Amino acid sequence: GSRGLGDVYKRQTIAFALTQKSLFSELVLIDSNHAKAEGEAMDLSHGLPFAHPMKVYAGDYKDIADCYLIIITAGTAQRPNETRLDMVHKNVEIFKSIIPNITKYNNSAILLVVSNPVDILTYCTIKLSGFPAGRVLGSGTVLDTARLKYHLGQQLCVDSRSIHAFITVSY
């Protein structure tokens, strides 16, 4: 199965997308606020009759023992006038608390980091987990590229799928 950890809005979006594909049989949401994760899991489960069969529930780190993909969305929200780099120290501290819990229960999964600043936190995850770099992936600039393509499509009045532009550096 796939497991999700962290930021509620990113987690909800990713979890919803995962329920739309038949890639996984199980999805567990882990949050320091277990009740919040339970509510999200229930909401997602109620939508499953329109998607693919899947077990969705709120869990704990012990529930990641047999998974092969762990998606990490943990981190603080970006505040007004705060850059992604301003968030580094706070998010590194969060990662110092969750990565050891992940590796305690599973040292063979692929880790996908989508927290910001993603490049720095992906590197941090490699170092904290001791996993080979090939098993720790970051979403990089995919979202920034999608936003650029959307806005260019709007400005140029063309389908954004026809835009071939990429953001290649974090900011």
Residue ranges, per PLM feature:
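Redox-cofactor binding/interface segments in oxidoreductases and associated redox assembly factors
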Residues: 70-72, 113-114
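Aromatic pocket-lining residues of Rossmann-like dinucleotide-binding sites
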Residues: 18
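Substrate/ligand-engaging "lid" and interaction regions
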Residues: 149-171
